[in-house]
């Protein structure tokens, strides 16, 4: 499977072409949404940096109509905070599409994951900071002081993405770890995370 966001928004017909060429089941449209002051949600591109002015709910519906097989839905507001998923956003998208919706952004513990699936209608969830910043130890149990880890602390320190050096796979001593998610509604999702050297430099 491949996930597409910026390319699809720049050329929505790309979804049609890709789904015809490879099948809908292989095409995941990633939507990065930010909540607005009027409680609407707009879609963003380039890792949540570029404003598009496109309504996220309408875009999800259009993505399905064009042949997307799944929606990977990221709440930029929640991502890296550890405050839990944006269940309102997930619910709004789930209510207008029939394809699976994968919720992403905000998970800090097992309750956030189970509550999101139970309360929002998500078919699956994706987790990132919980794993990237050591919220899970090696035997899979949760570390209690998650709030001192990862993006939350990074943002408090006024961190900038410019602080990160350029990386490529050949420079990383560890490459791919595959997390096989539970099977929901007959769909099996595999989320692949790149695990970079944590103490590099």
What residues fall within each predicted segment?
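Catalytic cores of alpha/beta
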Residues: 1, 13-16, 88-127
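Conserved anion-binding
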Residues: 1-73, 77-78
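PLP-dependent amino-acid enzyme catalytic core
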Residues: 8, 62, 77-97, 101, ...
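Short gly/pro/ser/thr-enriched loop/turn and capping motifs at secondary-structure boundaries
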Residues: 9-11, 36, 109, 132-135
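Charged helix-capping and loop-helix junction motifs
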Residues: 12, 53-57, 83-92, 141
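C-terminal helical cap(s) of enzyme catalytic domains, especially alpha/beta-barrels
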Residues: 15-22, 114-194
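Conserved, mostly hydrophobic/aromatic
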Residues: 29, 63, 71, 93, ...
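A structural motif corresponding to the C-terminal end of an alpha-helix
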Residues: 62-70, 96-99, 171-182
